[in-house]
Amino acid sequence: MPATEMFTIGPVNERPSFRLKVMRFAMKNSGFKIDYFSANVVEIEHEKVMFVTTIDFCMRTRLISLLLITVSVFAAACSRSVMTGAQQVGEYLPMLSGKRIAVVANQTSVVERSHLVDTLLAMGVNVKCVFGPEHGFRGQADAGEHLSDNTDPQTGLPVVSLYGKHRKPTAADMDSLDMVIFDIQDVGVRFYTYISTLHYVMEACAENNVPLLVLDRPNPNGFYIDGPVLDTAVTRSFVGMHPVPLVHGMTIGEYAMMLNGEHWLAGGKQCRLTVVPCRNYTHSTHYQLPIKPSPNLPTYRSVLLYPSLGLFEGTFMSVARGTEFPFEAIGHPDYNVAPFRFTPHSVSGAKYPPFKDVECCGYDLRGISIDSLETDARINLKWLIDSYKYFQSKPDFFNSFLSRLAGPELRKQIEQGMTEDEIRQSWQDGLRKFQTIRKKYLLYEDF
């Protein structure tokens, strides 16, 4: 097999990476014919670097000349935008040389149109295995669905599930590794489980003396903090492991630094942590995800509504799982407050939604503008309080899951008739204390 080489093809300060394809390229008098050629161009220290398969020096030189013309055409059309840590291959590729690597990844772990794992393999990185979080490596499993270890059919790599028989890599999993890479898109909400997976991966790295490299990604809800700070002495679970607000306003890289710096890992341990930050990002950036972070957050609006509507998972109401608009509506078969109707069905990512095949009544929140959600920048408690009042005669409106999502106080406050303003006021002391902690670990200009 021909070797893979890396060369600089000249400074271009435009978009960090893209894929070029030259179909049926033939070089006269070279003795070679290429039916399919593919080259990755990635930024390394503000230059474009191309990874190509070496065939012949003379041919390679002519081929790069041809591709440079194509690069200039594409680059002229590209504007500067947010760059994720994964896109900055030049920042972390040297760290991987000669090392045995595991990657904590899912469908969001992309470098432009290529998956990070595919990109690393193409560059000759020795990827030994993949650790998969909730929803799996390819992001197709239901929320809460336990997954078994398996083999990825596309790469042949073993996939170790961190949402099955165990949620923390074992010593045996870590034994043959020199480094772990974590690259998963989070949404900045405490009960979204990717930060809990991060916690357990960091613990495993600390306990087994394996360095962790976090490739940072923007937080689409990173422009505010809100909600009750969880009292982990009272309530601690996989949907709430740390004393942070429901909306914490940190990227996954900043969050990892906080877990390390505040000694929140078991036994106060710290792992050897490196974070590759994003570029062109601040906490005032409204970042729309290029790929849905999980099956039931398919749109930017659903991501923005998730902190508010996620609380309804602690009730007997539906958040429209099993429809084309999960987390963009709320309802119940007996919630006759508006003419809107929807019927959940078994679909990929929601095989057994609440009220499967039963018509629900409620509110369609897709009419709320993105601008208003971004401007409001806070959890909406009114929907939850109003729904409770409507069903107040039903003692099973709330379920025990709400305490794990929000802590035990929120249910008590609503049942006692506290207003939204009164409940919000009760959060302020905890939010102020958390803000002091948070500021120590920020990598980006704050809102």
Walk through the language-model features, giving the residues of each:
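Intrinsic low-complexity, disordered N-terminal segments enriched in polar/charged/small residues
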Residues: P2-M6, K21, F25-M27, I34
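Bacterial Sec-dependent N-terminal signal peptides
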Residues: F32, F37-S38, V42, H46-V82
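Short internal beta-strands
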Residues: K128-E134
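Glycine-rich, charge-decorated loop segments at or immediately adjacent to ligand/cofactor-binding or catalytic sites
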Residues: G139-G144, L213-T235
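Glycine-rich oxoanion-binding loops at beta->alpha junctions
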Residues: S148-L177, V189
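Conserved anion/nucleotide-ligand pocket segment
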Residues: R236-Y306
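Glycine-rich, aromatic-lined ligand/substrate-binding cores of catalytic
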Residues: R279-K356
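Conserved functional hotspot residues or short segments at active or partner-binding sites
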Residues: P326, I330-Q428
